[in-house]
Amino acid sequence: MRCKRCNGSNFERDEDTGNSYCGGCGTLREYDNYEAQLGGIRGPQGTYIRVGTIGRGSVLDYKDKKIYEANNLIEETTERLNLGNKTEVIKSMISKLTDGEFGQGEWFPILIGACCYAVVREEGKGVLSMEEVAYEVGCDLHQLGPMIKRVVDHLDLELREFDLVGLFTKTVTNSPRLTDVDRDKKEKIIKQGTFLMNCALKWFLSTGRRPMPLVVAVLAFVVQVNGVKVKIDDLAKDASVSLTTCKTRYKELSEKLVKVAEEVGLPWAKDVTVKNVLKHSGTLFALMEAKSMKKRKQGTGKELVRTDGFCVEDLVMDCLSKESMYCYDDDARQDTMSRYFDVEGERQLSLCNYDDNISENQLSTKYNEFEDRVCGGTLAKRSQGSSQSMWQRRSVFGMVSTENWWKGKSELSKRLLLKDLLEKDVGLEALPPSYIKGCVAVERRREKIKAAKLRINAIQHPSDNVSEGALSLELEHSKKKRKKGSEIDWEDLVIQTLVLHNVNEEEIEKGHYKTLLDLHVFNSGEV
């Protein structure tokens, strides 16, 4: 190799540095003394960092450092979720899932949260919602849910029933809105909420849905029954759930209670609506609690034995005979609710042998007699003696006091397994709302299919004997229908198209229009 500067070939080597230089011009020869530092007898070593280590000054290699940081993250997450005693179990699960490699990145905290949730659900001794886990690990529910499913499937875990009652109790205990409520009233809220939550479970209001909105709805209802001024907006905000969903659950719960009033045969059931069902909650809760405590006598057919001494006729008579409890006194600072049932009064409800189904005429007669006494008789005169104590007819059944009608002795006031809960009778047997909506949708599609067939038949086989008057009348009628907004919509057109392509009606009723159009109309399923 010649010198790049003078093109000479006389090179000499420096004794001190060992570098070659040109004897003519003194230019150093490039790459003459180069040694690769990627291997050799001195071990794996790079130019700036040692190969296999995490950086300058570290004594741990990459894998050890990754496992060390992963363990620290697991410990921090379990401490925030109050699962410090389950740290080693969660570490073992993650090690098994990752073949001992653990991990780094945005997916790893989600995996930790999924394992925490799976451990709690598998043992069934604690309460941990997915919303709480997602908040602590900093992810969305749609990211956490699939990860939990993968963990459960990979480890072949069997999760127990979700403890909605425990979640309700935890929410009440930790709610900042109830810190000023006295201990006795908070205990009553927990018991009544547990009872109503079990009823909601029996009515399938939680089936296939997120649990937290239902918990907020039940809590909002119960605190109003007990006279605590807390808005559902604040409870939803504290629980970090959608306010719209919470209000929907609240409405569904109110609708079920209205149906309970109809099923148990209250004489004033026609006056109970979704808007005022809260005012009648004392009556409904007392009836539902008493009804849930009755047991069927074995070996005697349909004969019933009541363990709580409950009888509908005695209950109504006892309610209507206590005149003093329907007088509203401002000075007494009573709750703005009437006391329908006084189970701790002088005359307790006695066991009776009347038929379980009392005629509605008897109950209505007693109710009308009581209402007449209120309007122009005995009870109305009570308001004439004091200027501050008066009778308000609008609030006859608009006041409920939770002090007397609530017993809290029913098994529904504590957590029950779903199979035991379904055997209880609370006055109403309901189907899941999603199932009801599905049946309604199928019936609607069935009617649309019939209408589509009629339209197709009218076009394919028009009547030859239609007079001009009948035709003009039909056109006028169609114009009126269009004005009312009842014209054919997109669903009618899709169903009509599928009917023209001879698609099975049962498949159309399922509502998978896009798939059916691809298969039968656009032929996208052909290979």
UniProtKB/Swiss-Prot annotation:
One of the GO biological process terms: embryo development ending in seed dormancy
GO MF entries: double-stranded DNA binding; protein homodimerization activity; RNA polymerase binding; TFIIB-class transcription factor binding; zinc ion binding
Disruption phenotype: Embryonic lethality and aborted seed when homozygous.
Compartment list: Nucleus
Range of residues in the leader sequence: none
Subunit text: Can form homodimer. Interacts with TBP2.
Name of this protein: Plant-specific TFIIB-related protein PTF2
Organism: Arabidopsis thaliana (Mouse-ear cress)
